[in-house]
Amino acid sequence: MSDPKDNKNEFDFLPPAEPPPSFNQEKDHYHEQVDAEDFGMVEDFGLQMEYSDEDLLPENTAPSSLNIGFVGVGGGGNKMANAFLELGFNKTLLVNTTGKDIPKNVAEDHVVLIPDSDGIGKNVDYGKEVLSQNGAIIEDALRIKLGKVDWLVVLAGGGGGTGSSVTALHPVFERYMRSVQSSGKVVYVVSWPTAQENLNPTIARNALTLANDVTKHPHVILDNERSTRLLRGRIGMLGMYPVANTQFAKSFAQVLKLSTEDSPIQSFDSKDLETCLSNDGRAFLGSTMIKDPNTAKLGSVILHNCMNRSSCPPPKGKAAAGSLILVASEEMVADPKVSKNLESAISYVGGRCETLFSGVYVRKNVPGLIAILSMNGLKQ
């Protein structure tokens, strides 16, 4: 994580019962030492597991108004989850059917490997069967390693076998969250293959299956074609997806961070964020920086830039809820004309949502007006 002083680049055996009396009770064996091996058991192995605080992953060091955890499923999901882990979201798990796709820098404590499997071979039906059969292993890992989180962000790559099968685990995620009395929901973040990748019928079919499966849940779709188009020519092929994953993670992390802060102008708080995230359907997240906000068309510029520069497909129709978070310099908020433009921009974007939550935050060294836009509860 970046230095917080540098604001330029911020964005979880019963005691033995009294034995029944015997007809020929010659000796009291109640206090007799009993070993597991006397019963033909392997020591430290049993149906009832004992959990300790030592099993819990460290608390998130990244600031967040929400008690949040991340789970990456499959190769693509593992890489997306790793981007959040590197930002300080320590309550992150990587679930996979093969260890070959786990990023090399991820500690073993964050990894959950499905036993007796070595990948799914892009077979979603088989993937769903494997994940369903091993749901108890994943549920135990969630409870033991994450403890209690209120919001669970599940990341998966569309096109592969394991990631595209992720919704087979939805009952597991919900059962875990009920067991720890979570107040939030499961939010999916799934990727859509590039145009070239979609030429492969199996990849295209798997991606479509995943997109359809998450439709009824809160979800974000990241279009890899848009991501690579934005980075092509500036980033080499090897670093393209890691950079795209980091960009999305940083943008979402800023929303989580800013919602912890008070603003002398207008705050976007945790309840606002929860209201946005709780809407079922697709969500859009985009951001932009505008060097000179001294324009009467600031609202349309923000909306246009956020849509064109986001990895998410542009929203269609009116969102059930949304948020516009602005980060401005002291000079901007002190300028009456710019302040009026900021108010107009919030109203303009608000017309695209049934309910818009907004926040305006001041930073000393901000290089331009930063805008982070989310639109939630989209029907498509």
Task: Give the role of each language-model region.
Residues 2-380:
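Tubulin/FtsZ superfamily GTPase core signature
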